[in-house]
Amino acid sequence: MIARHDQSAILSQAVEHGDTVYLAGIVATDLSKDVKGQTKEILDEIDRLLGKCGSSKSKVIQCHIWVSDIRNRVPMNEVWTEWVDKKNLPARACVEAKLADPKALVEIMVIAGK
């Protein structure tokens, strides 16, 4: 079974396939926030989407993080460290990339189990 959630004209924010949940790349909606604020907003949205799919941050398997400037990795990691389930750390990559909106400082994509 495949279930798609929060669809737009071009993508689904979350897709369930069997016991796996795939989240699209999530960016903050309030791009006036600093990197910590954007990261917090993104992680809150990840919590919401995972919950909608019957999952949680404790079941995150893999996470890809893009930052517009690698120097933002340190403040992003401060927020990440407060959020992540320390007993169930996912595989993770964090790289610098030019994001679609120049005001976006962070984008996070997650794969989780149920």
Question: Would you name each region that the model predicts?
Answer:
Residues 1-61, 67-114:
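N-terminal presequence-like segments and the immediate start of the first folded domain
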